[in-house]
């Protein structure tokens, strides 16, 4: 396997996966539920939590550098093969479904430039023209990654820099237009009629999703030129993303009063740019949104393909997915991922169904590995500092699972259950020496039993 990803490429991978479409709607989303005071508290709590998680990943890359693809291997090493498989399966499934949403968003954003009241070309990203365009983009990225992860990561670095340009312009203009009196207007949100701590909770329900992707460098750590860069890249990307989110949300409240900002249609950053620089502002943000989502899609495709590949090399996924091509790209895993994305795109067009519930449930599955990162560090830590970071990361991971909805976690067993067949088949393809132990049999039984009421609740 090639080990060519340097610090800049790893940092760009993490930053690009976190900075997707959400940042462009963050001003309105936050203003609708919270005052400036609540925002400051919410960002403070979340910032501390995500930094603890980033530090946990950094520490693990230093004390267990031999564990490549941490999201899967940390869970496997710490809690057994079945837990490791479920971590990898849930992460991969979430990445596939999220990639479908990215492709839909790209062509929904393109409709800003193409659609008129008389002509609906791309619409909400689910017209046949959108599906054709999304399919073309899907396979262009597919063959790009087949040329080598390093090539794709280099292009992702350029895309990350490109997506930072409109965000940087927005921040500069917002600083120039910022008025402290506007920012302090109803500072504690009396007009919302909700206590400050309730507002804080509401902000954190939004904030918890904007750092999904923090694990990017850890996932591709096997391809890092220097293992020490993995932890550095994670920390640098988290600090950069946190800075962008803070500036975008707080400065916006100094440009437009909170009640007015809460009414701006999304992506609200476009409306603010029109306020600050005229009609061209909307075009700049629409273009920035497209570039940003394309970059995030590229990052997530790299990570989605890496997880089954690494799981297969550790005998958790069927042996075929351990194959690489001549350019050391995880070819079999990439084909699996993108064929699944293509099928989902076709189903969206054929059924016209709303897959937001499925996306929410799958997103819950990506939070479980975050908790397991903290739990693994807590399990193996020897120094008081490492134990403290592990405890903090565990608490943050549990908060993420609680805040995103325990019911969705229960429903996620519907998606875990089919994975058990993959797990059992993988053991057969690898001529696995170990039969199922008692713990694994109990866990499989619990998942199968829970999947019955969960399926009924989902379809009922």
Labelled PLM ranges:
Residues 72-75, 112-117, 203, 235-300, ...:
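TM-loop-TM module centered on a large, flexible mid-protein loop between adjacent transmembrane helices
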Residues 1-2, 40, 117-129, 157-286:
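Helix-loop-helix junctions that connect adjacent transmembrane segments
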Residues 31, 42, 51-138, 142-146, ...:
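Hydrophobic transmembrane alpha-helices that form the core helical bundles
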Residues 384-460:
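A generic transmembrane alpha-helix motif of multi-pass inner-membrane proteins
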Residues 110, 129-180, 234-238, 365-369, ...:
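Membrane-interface loop-to-helix entry segments
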Residues 76, 103-132, 166, 223-227, ...:
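Helix-loop-helix connectors at the membrane interface of multi-pass transporters/channels
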Residues 31-35, 39-40, 114-127, 150-160, ...:
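Transmembrane helix-loop boundary segments of multi-pass membrane transporters
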């Amino acid at each position: 396997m090639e080990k060519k990803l340097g610090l800049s490429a790893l940092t760009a991978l993490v930053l690009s996966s976190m900075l997707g479409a959400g940042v462009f709607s963050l001003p309105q989303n936050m203003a609708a539920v919270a005052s400036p005071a609540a925002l400051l508290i919410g960002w403070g709590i979340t910032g501390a939590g995500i930094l603890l998680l980033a530090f946990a990943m950094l520490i693990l890359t230093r004390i267990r550098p031999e564990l490549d693809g941490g999201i899967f291997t940390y869970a496997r090493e710490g809690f057994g093969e079945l837990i490791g498989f479920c971590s990898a399966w849930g992460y991969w499934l979430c990445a596939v479904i999220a990639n479908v949403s990215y492709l839909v968003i790209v062509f929904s954003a393109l409709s800003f430039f193409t659609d008129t009241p008389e002509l609906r070309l791309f619409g909400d990203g689910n017209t046949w023209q959108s599906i054709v365009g999304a399919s073309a983009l899907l396979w262009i990225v597919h063959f790009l990654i087949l040329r080598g992860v390093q090539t794709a990561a280099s292009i992702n670095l350029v895309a990350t820099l490109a997506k930072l340009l409109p965000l940087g312009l927005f921040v500069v203009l917002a600083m120039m237009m910022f008025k402290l009196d506007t920012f302090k207007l109803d500072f504690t949100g009396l007009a919302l009629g909700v206590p400050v701590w309730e507002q804080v909770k509401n902000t954190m329900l939004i904030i918890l999703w904007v750092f999904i992707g923090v694990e990017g460098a850890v996932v591709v750590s096997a391809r890092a030129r220097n293992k020490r860069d993995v932890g550095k890249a994670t920390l640098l990307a988290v600090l950069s993303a946190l800075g962008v989110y803070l500036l975008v949300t707080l400065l916006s409240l100094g440009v437009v009063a909170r009640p007015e900002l809460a009414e701006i249609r999304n992506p609200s950053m476009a409306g603010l740019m029109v306020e600050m620089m005229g009609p061209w502002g909307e075009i700049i943000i629409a273009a920035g949104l497209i570039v940003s989502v394309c970059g995030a899609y590229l990052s997530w495709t790299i990570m989605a393909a890496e997880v089954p590949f690494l799981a297969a090399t550790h005998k958790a996924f069927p042996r075929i997915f351990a194959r690489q091509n001549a350019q050391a790209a995880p070819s079999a895993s990439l084909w699996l991922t993108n064929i699944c994305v293509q099928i989902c795109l076709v189903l969206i067009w054929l059924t016209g169904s709303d897959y937001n519930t499925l996306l929410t449930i799958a997103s819950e599955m990506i939070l479980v590995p975050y908790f397991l990162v903290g739990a693994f560090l807590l399990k193996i830590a020897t120094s008081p500092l490492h134990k403290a970071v592990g405890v903090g990361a565990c608490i943050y991971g549990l908060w993420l699972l609680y805040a995103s909805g325990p019911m969705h976690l229960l429903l996620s067993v519907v998606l875990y259950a089919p994975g058990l067949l993959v797990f059992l088949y993988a053991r057969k393809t690898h001529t696995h020496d170990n039969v199922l132990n008692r713990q694994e049999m109990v866990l499989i039984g619990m998942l199968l039993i829970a999947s019955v009421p969960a399926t009924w609740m989902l379809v009922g």
